[in-house]
Amino acid sequence: MRISWREFIKQYFSKPSKFHSIGIEMGDAELHLNVIQKKSGSYQWVKQHSLPMQDWVKHLQEYVTQNNLARTPCHVALGLNKYQLFQIDRPEVEEQEVAQAIQWQVKEQLTSTDEHVFDYYDHPAAIGGKEKVNVVAISRPQVTSIIKGISQADLKLSTITIEELATSELLAASDDAVLSLFQEKGGQINLNILKQGKLFFSRRLKGYENLASFSLQEFQMGMGDTLSVEIQRSMDYFESQLRQAPVRHIVVHLNTPIQAQLAELIKELTFMPVSIMDLPLTPNEPSPTVSLASLGAALTDIEINSEAGQ
């Protein structure tokens, strides 16, 4: 069989990536990435890295080339400041018309004059007898920039998600409700309540951006009480408004060197079992900080409770 050099080169450069996925978090100052590879039927967390957001496309191109990541499926997670999230009544229209109908309900609430792209995901429980949807609004220029940038870096863009959903991928599905407190370095605390793998409730807790600099004494003198009140309010809403069984467990992964002591303090103040989250995979390259949104994005299509740890 004869094959031209041009055809050979084309086939060579279209070979699939040896990596399973790459998760990218678009933060405020940095782009964080995690890479998953499947070897002998087991998923392995093989790389984690951070790049400056300034000229991020150039930096990402260089990293992809240096680490042979070309054509790897890529899942992008937007940091909390990159989008707006609204909860509204589900429009009473045909399924195919929902995406269009939601735009008119949230446009007046947008804080930016940019043209926006909208998407939504259904809320798993009715509130006050009404079905709800969570609407995500992202500026169109930002989406266009991401699509072009990922393509220029020679990655295969699979999904664009948000931090609340990406971090939800880190917890195995459970019939009991679990409240998670997750925080990226210098960010707000992201409070989620999950049940059976579904996100029932999400809040952003402000005022904890400098959590790493707070001492245990500062928490004991009042900050811990404030945080426990926010937790209790969220659990009360989950039970009373969403009519769900009580939360059974709290999981934390916070940006603080005293995380173990803080977890114990939360346990004492809420009278709830509290544990520090075990990451679903062990990194090949240990790092003092982990981008949870980036890791969760990389695990988007992996059942962590049954496959990832095998």
Language model features: what each stretch is:
Residues 1-310:
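Hydrophobic/aromatic-enriched cytosolic interaction surfaces used to assemble or bind macromolecules
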